[in-house]
Each structure stands twice: as C-alpha cells, then as structure tokens.
C-alpha cells in the first residue's frame, strides 16, 4: 500500500519548472547533483561563505573537462519559501557559473517541502533524459543536503503540507537509496540538528552519510569534498557511494 501511495504522490508532482532542453551533441552520461541549502534565519552568519563556496564548486567542476560535460547541477535554498536558484541542467549551461546566486538567510525551515521540490527537479529531469532521442543515460543522482536545525513551521495549513511532503520524501529516499538509484549526503551545521532525522534522510540505517561541521572553515571544506565527489562520480559512476563512509570527512 505504501508503494501505491508513493507512486500516486509521484504522479502528482509539479514538473513544470524543470529544464526541458538538452545539448544533444553532448553524449556524456549525465550525473545529476543537487545542492539543497537551509537558509533559515539561524544560517545568517554563513551567507557570504555559501556564496563563495558555491562559486568555487562551479570553478572546480568546470576546470575538469569530463566532469563539466557530465555534471548536471541544481541549487535550491529553503526557509519559509523554497527557491530554485538554478534548475537541474548541464553545468556548462549555467551562464553565471554560480556568481549570480544569493543566499538570503531568514525565516523558518520547511525541510519536507524543500525535499519535495528537489525530487521534482530529479524526477522531471530523468523524464527528459528518457524521452530524448537518442535517450540520455544517467548515473544515480546525488543530493547534498545542508542544514543547521530541524523542520520548523508556525502556520497550521503549511504544517500539514510540510508533514505530508516529509512523509513521502522519506519513503521516496528510502526506496531509491535501497535500490541504489539515489545518494543523499546530509551535513549537520553546528549542534542543533535533529541527528536522527538527518540520518533518516540519507536512506541508510547508519551514519555513513551524515557529516558534521562545526564552523565556517569546515563548511567551506565540505564544498571542496562535494566537488571531489562530483568530479570522481561523473567519470566512474555513483553506484558505489552508498557504501562509502563520509561521516569522518571534514
């Protein structure tokens, strides 16, 4: 019954705000990667660091020709609203290469709805791959999820939507990770995250994909690790990442 409900939920997703274009002369197998960043009020001290780190991430990937051809990147931020800063598409098609992205930290933490928007980007883009002629192959997508707290909402109507989204996102992640069709790496910033939730959102039963950062230096280093993961996976695939322990990486 859970799978039937999940499939119904997936069919209800809004895929209208998904990049439909592909560069057909690019025959590389695609690696979809999403950076999902909590920009609630408590992340305010990291605004400039996030901006600079994302620019450096773009630069690192773009310097590697093979990775640049294979990587498709999306950047989303979330607080009381969910913002698609960059749709999931070939990184070469991001004209500003991250220089236009701004992280304004304020408001609440709608984690479930943010994950739903992330899944819409992934599912929509996979549909584009499937319907392209010739069909575009892809590696398992990677979600890099960064937060310093836990879901927070004070509006009753929004809370209902948040709870529903969180329920289905957990089911989706658990299923896709279990079938090795998705990788989620959670990053706890500081000491106030809901650790059990951050682990659950990796789809794994242990802490292998939960990273902990305590300061700006460690958060900046996480983005360097992220670029290394993306560059490597764009060449050799992401299929083995769910076996890799990232919990001690800083």
Give, region by region, the residue ranges found by the protein language model.
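Von Willebrand factor
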Residues: 26-87, 96-139, 142-146, 183-196
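VWA/integrin I-like adhesion module and closely mimicked acidic/polar interface patches used
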Residues: 149-204
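Short beta-strand-loop
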Residues: 70-101, 195-203
């Amino acid at each position: 019954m859970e799978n039937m409900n999940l499939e119904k939920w997936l069919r209800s997703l809004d895929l209208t705000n998904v990049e439909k274009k592909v560069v057909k002369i690019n025959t590389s197998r695609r690696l979809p990667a999403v950076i999902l960043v909590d920009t609630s009020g408590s992340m305010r001290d990291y605004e400039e660091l996030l901006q600079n780190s994302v620019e450096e991430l773009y630069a690192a990937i773009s310097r590697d020709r093979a990775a640049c051809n294979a990587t498709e990147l999306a950047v989303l931020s979330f607080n009381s609203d969910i913002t698609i800063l960059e749709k999931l598409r070939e990184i070469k098609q991001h004209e500003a290469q991250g220089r236009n992205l701004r992280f304004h930290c304020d408001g609440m933490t709608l984690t479930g709805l943010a994950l739903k928007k992330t899944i819409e980007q992934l599912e929509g883009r996979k549909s584009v791959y499937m319907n392209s002629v010739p069909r575009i192959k892809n590696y398992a997508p990677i979600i890099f999820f960064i937060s310093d707290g836990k879901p927070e909402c004070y509006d009753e109507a929004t809370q209902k939507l948040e709870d529903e989204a969180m329920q289905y996102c957990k089911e989706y992640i658990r299923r896709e990770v279990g079938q090795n069709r998705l990788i989620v790496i959670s990053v706890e910033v500081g000491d106030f995250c809901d650790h059990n939730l951050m682990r659950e959102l990796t789809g794994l039963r242990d802490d292998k994909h939960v990273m902990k950062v305590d300061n700006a230096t460690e958060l900046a280093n996480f983005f360097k690790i992220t670029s290394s993961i993306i560059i490597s996976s764009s060449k050799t695939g992401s299929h083995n990442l769910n076996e890799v322990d990232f919990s001690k990486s800083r």
